[in-house]
Design a protein with these regions (language model features):
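Trp/Gly-enriched beta-strand/coil motifs that build multi-repeat beta-propeller-like domains
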Residues: 1-232
Length: 232
């Protein structure tokens, strides 16, 4: 997503691969107005616009009005979420007021998601810049420049951060984008460049120094970069 427009293509393969020049335009404008835009593992696109939550298949042409065709699955209150994301089985996780919740995604506009969701983190979750899952169901998080990994918390008092594996000691807050794709590779944008590699396995693993450069310059212009991640 760049300059309010929405594009799709398979990921770049090398540093000089002109991704945006060869990508298909599937949305002409307004897409940067979404606070959250992300995929369910089945390929359904979910988005928060204002205080409302929508879902629909992704657009297939630039002339399509996605939001007019989408199903409203949340009528109000969704602007409070700092982070919203799916695990690879399609369970929705959300962070608000420092707390972490999980539940199946809402199915209609009056579905009281947060009122019936399971609280799996009582506080402190606001410190994370990124939270996301890999295809195997491990939860990754970036806070204070550090990169953590662990199975997701299963109850409200589960000390996830304190018992997670540290897989990066510094510098991870500099990334503008950080996410997995279905191939199990970790993709990241930092200083306008786009990289990919297997995820770091230990704290001193020099991910950026050994990652493959797949995009030179301009990648910081994207508000969202995303793909569906189903269970591997």
């Amino acid at each position: 997503m760049n300059n309010g427009r929405f594009y799709k293509r398979y990921p770049p393969q090398h540093a000089l691969d002109n991704w945006i020049g060869t990508a298909e335009l599937i949305g002409r404008g307004g897409w940067t107005n979404f606070k959250h835009l992300f995929f369910h593992p089945d390929g359904t696109l979910y988005g928060v616009w204002g205080n409302k939550f929508y879902k629909a298949p992704p657009p297939t042409s630039a002339s399509q009005s996605w939001i007019d065709e989408a199903t409203l699955v949340g009528a109000a209150g969704w602007q409070v979420f700092q982070l919203l994301f799916f695990d690879p089985h399609g369970v929705l996780y959300g962070v608000t007021d420092g707390k972490l919740y999980r539940r199946s995604p809402p199915t209609h506009s009056l579905d009281d998601w947060i009122g019936s969701a399971t609280l799996v983190g009582t506080g402190g979750w606001h410190v994370f810049k990124f939270l996301f899952f890999d295809p195997q169901g491990f939860l990754y998080g970036v806070e204070n420049g550090k990169f953590h990994k662990r199975s997701p918390p299963c109850h409200a008092n589960d000390n996830w951060l304190g018992s997670s594996t540290l897989v990066g000691t510094a510098g991870w807050s500099s990334f503008q984008q950080l996410f997995f794709m279905g191939d199990g590779q970790l993709y990241g944008v930092v200083n306008g460049n786009f990289y990919k590699r297997s995820p770091p396995a230990y704290s001193m693993d020099n991910w950026l120094g050994s990652a493959k450069l797949i995009g030179v310059g301009g990648w910081s212009g994207f508000k969202f970069l995303m793909a569906p991640v189903a269970h591997g």
